[in-house]
Amino acid sequence: MLDLLENDRRFDPATFSPCRTWRYRLERQWGRGPKAAFILLNPSTADETKDDPTIRRCIGFAKAWGFGGLVLGNIFALRSTDPRGLYSHADPVGPDNDEALRGIAREAEKVVCGWGTHGALNDRGRFALAVLREAGADPLALKVTAEGFPGHPLYISADTVPKAFA
């Protein structure tokens, strides 16, 4: 029997707003094990069928830790290739993002935060952390910046082990 999970990308769901301005969650599945979650800053170009450097990096971490898949969420759901776009948009969080974060936190075995210093915008990082905890997650980080924010996985060594994030 052929295992389609490893190579067939048709089964990787993503949740967008109807206008696709906001992406609330993105999944990748390659095995039958539990999922890891990554909660980052904001979505870029990855979608149901296309990966970007960040999702590829998160897949590498999750595979190294023995997970069979991952789910990616963001503290801001606005799709933008430049974080500066978050500062000028009327609603960078997105109308359904907090509920999406709650769902991700409930279903993942491990929740790794990595939104970096832009999480200070509107104190969103602190609020998102509270949402994750209220949903039952014990948030982790690969690195904590000097300012106290969880470092983005794209800029962290592949052999880094996540630690509790206060």
Regions found by a protein language model. Name each.
Residues G68-R84:
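Short connector loops at secondary-structure junctions
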Residues P43-S44, A77-L78, H118, A146-E147:
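Short, solvent-exposed loop/turn segments at secondary-structure junctions
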Residues L41-A46, P83-S88, C113:
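Short, basic, glycine/proline-bearing loop/turn elements
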Residues M1-D52:
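Active-site and ligand/interface coordination hotspots across diverse enzymes
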Residues R20, D52-I59, D91-E99:
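Short acidic (Asp/Glu) patches
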Residues S44-G66:
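A short mixed-secondary-structure module that forms the rim of ligand-binding clefts
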Residues L86-A166:
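Glycine/proline-rich loop-helix segments at beta-alpha junctions forming the active-site rim
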